[in-house]
């Protein structure tokens, strides 16, 4: 289980206090991990995006020390194009190992052609060298590579809980069916829910989500 700061409400931003609150939440729930999600290194998929440099408002050593004091380890989100830029992932993964990062979540691949499949394998192998776990978001369905590289913890490849922010397509019937379809292929990152208890008639997708 992992706390995930992407399910933001209202005007919550990528800030030190917010990250620490999610670390506290992970500790309270007995979860071992907290994911520092998109924009931790500033705007992503931009020419100047650098996956080795935290955004100016974030003090990464302080965050990681705080997490260690709570017996929580951190994951980092990455945009796939930023990972590929000049093979920057090789330097970045070595840096994350020094920081004590538990794993990385790479997002928005959205393809399953041969070139992309080969890329997945290169990334998994490089991550393994640095004792990091990996979660592929925006990913195709599992293909068995996790049997060779168990540091591939999970992947999305599913219409999961985050869709409830902007869609009514995630129904009880859909969720029950997943156990007999998608989950047969391998580990699944369903993504978080909003922890709101309403009937189907009373549910309204809203992004950003709000808590009454």
Walk through the language-model features, giving the residues of each:
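An acidic-aromatic substrate-binding cleft motif
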Residues: 1-29, 33
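Short, conserved micro-motifs enriched in small and acidic residues
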Residues: 16, 210-212
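Aromatic- and carboxylate-enriched substrate-binding clefts and catalytic-loop regions
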Residues: 37-210
